[in-house]
Amino acid sequence: MLDALHLPGMTRGNVQVFTRVSTVTNTQWLTWQKPRGVSMLQAIVIGGGGGGGGGFTRAAAAAGGGGGGGGSSAVTRITIPAVCVPDQLFIQVGAGGQGVGSGGGTAGSGVLSYICIAPDTAAANTLAVSGAAAAVGGGTGTGAAVGAAGTAGTIATIGAMPLAGLGQFAFIAGQIGIAGGAVAGAAGGAQTIPVTSVLTTGGAGGAGTTSADFAGGGFTAITASLLSEARPATPAAGTVAGSGGFLLGPPRYPLFSFGGCGGSAANATAGGAGGNGGPGSGGGGGGAGTTGGRGGDGGGGLVIICAW
């Protein structure tokens, strides 16, 4: 059989996926063992997404803002000759931030993910880290203001992962979450599918209300886009939770993670909860109501190591 373009055969690769998360840096390490006979490795490193803020709890016909969606993690990718790395690497997968309910303040931030040559995240040990700053959670709505959008995770720097100089590396910033719907009453802010090459998305905003029901935020449609066709469904108005995010992948889709949709707002009943984010993506904000909806949790991180 001819070797087309001198590329390795499809059956010769080794792919390991790490998803068990750690809530505290430098604890709960996982290990990767170098497979026999490989010459190259590539890794995708994604941290935890930010949680969604809660919708405001208020009496019927009173003003209340929706919760803000959490930001998404930045993404780091490295490609290194296998001969340049030890036979064992240590992996930490960062947890997603927890969503909060009404009055809970800013939702939890995500935790960074790491690949290290020893079970310690000191820069001298680090082959790859998902970013410089983790994704931040969204803010909680009040009677006077909407919940703020959660800040996106920022790109890593080579100074924080100097061993990546053994190969090639790429850094991609995360996506900001979306603010909650207006206190006068409005649908939650919709999120957009990014065109920056990031694989994660921020969470959408929860709806606000004064005297009517409003839908939580979803994802804006894109014409003739396969990813757009697969996006989470936008919730209906009323006591309706936002759709949860999820991870797409082969054979039909590329690797891509959606954040959670925002919870809907209800004037005379409870607001809907925000949807949880997919891996590395933000949780949706909660909707306002007589009991404000809780924001969704940010998705836990993801580390994939391919060797061939």
Regions found by a protein language model. Give the residues of each.
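Glycine-rich strand-loop-strand elements at beta-sheet edges
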Residues: 21-35, 45-119, 123, 137-154, ...
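Local beta-strand/beta-hairpin segments that build beta-sheet-rich folds
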Residues: 17-18, 122-128
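Long, low-complexity, polar/charged, intrinsically disordered or flexibly structured peripheral segments
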Residues: 201-278
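Compositionally biased low-complexity segments at domain edges in trafficked proteins
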Residues: 131-180
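Enriched but not universal
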Residues: 1-40, 77, 174, 224-228, ...
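Glycine-rich, low-complexity segments
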Residues: 1-24, 140-142, 181, 186-194, ...
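Chymotrypsin/trypsin-fold serine protease catalytic domain
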Residues: 159-160, 164-178, 189-197, 205, ...
